[in-house]
A protein has these predicted regions:
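Primarily recognizes the serine-hydrolase "nucleophile elbow" in alpha/beta-hydrolase
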Residues: 137-220
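Acidic catalytic loop of the alpha/beta-hydrolase fold
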Residues: 205, 231-236
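Short beta-strand element of the alpha/beta-hydrolase
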Residues: 82-91
Length: 289
């Protein structure tokens, strides 16, 4: 992308993110947007371009056609900053991203607790392996630039919702082999997170008898993992498959299943599941990250 096009895109991006933040009434300032790939996006046949924002009938905002993946950075206030980081991966079935209710709203809450938050806008639609490359690259970039962000490089969690939870699980439970051509010095550091937050995941029960999907490897050397889902979610088996595999591997896992909530609630006011998980997650994060 030329310098001129990059400048224009950055202006569009600021308007995009700023508009989305206004929609969800985020009170903590975004400080930066960082593109993951300085040159060509690996395994992509699409040119870099601006994403598409749509609003559906229920008022939810979705972003798709992300061809130049990036993360948005949110800083806590100096007096509350705890030097820990959380990368948030919105869901959307690998077709779109629910960036407000599963991205910026969660970021706003986490920043209020003192965490530096990075909302990952990974490639969609239909780019699962590309999204995983984006995930690996984002972790490495953030860890490599830990001094810049004033965070501990060994205190980085990945939080994902729905398809984003599948992506988060892959980041901590796949082999550590880099899945793309090395770009720069950031790709010399570890791409593994230090903790996983798995929110109403999908795609994790693809193994025999609805067991853990084979691309995920459960060992006892895994990040501490928090899992949350509701029993009336049609894909709740994903949480059971993950928790069972982690239990058998004697990994550190905490599973919460509430009776009702459905799927895709994020931090929706009035949804009991949405109101329950922050209460459970806050002390867990404080202890395990």
């Amino acid at each position: 992308m030329s310098n001129f096009r990059q400048t224009v895109y950055m202006k569009v991006l600021k308007l995009l993110v700023g508009g989305l933040l206004a929609l969800c009434q985020v009170v903590h300032a975004q400080i930066d947007s960082v593109f993951l790939w300085p040159q060509n996006v690996p395994n992509s046949t699409k040119p870099k371009g601006k994403p598409i924002i749509t609003t559906i009938a229920d008022g939810s905002t979705r972003v798709t056609e992300i061809t130049d993946p990036f993360f948005a950075v949110f800083e806590p206030r100096k007096e509350t900053k705890n030097n820990k980081a959380v990368i948030v991966c919105p869901g959307g079935a690998y077709v779109r991203l629910a960036v407000i209710k599963e991205g910026y709203s969660a970021a706003n809450w986490l920043v209020g607790l003192g965490y530096t938050v990075f909302v990952l806008h990974y490639r969609v639609p239909d780019a699962r392996e590309g999204a995983f490359q984006d995930m690996q690259r984002a972790i490495r970039l953030i860890r490599f630039n830990s001094k810049k962000y004033a965070i501990n490089p060994d205190k980085i969690a990945v939080m994902g919702f729905s398809a984003g939870a599948h992506l988060a699980a892959r980041s901590g439970m796949s082999d550590s082999i880099i899945k793309y051509p090395k770009q720069d010095g950031a790709d010399e550091v570890s791409g593994k997170p230090n903790a996983l937050i798995i929110m109403y995941p999908g795609y994790l029960d693809g193994g025999p008898g609805k067991s853990l999907s084979p691309e995920l490897k459960a060992t006892n050397n895994l990040p501490h993992t928090f899992i949350f889902q509701s029993m009336d979610d049609g894909i709740v088996q994903s949480s059971f498959a993950l928790a069972s595999a982690l239990r058998d591997a004697k990994a550190n896992v905490e599973l919460h299943i509430v009776p009702k909530g459905g799927h895709g609630y994020g931090m929706t006011p009035g949804n009991k599941a949405a109101e329950a998980w922050p209460i459970l997650l806050a002390p867990w994060l404080k202890e395990h990250l």
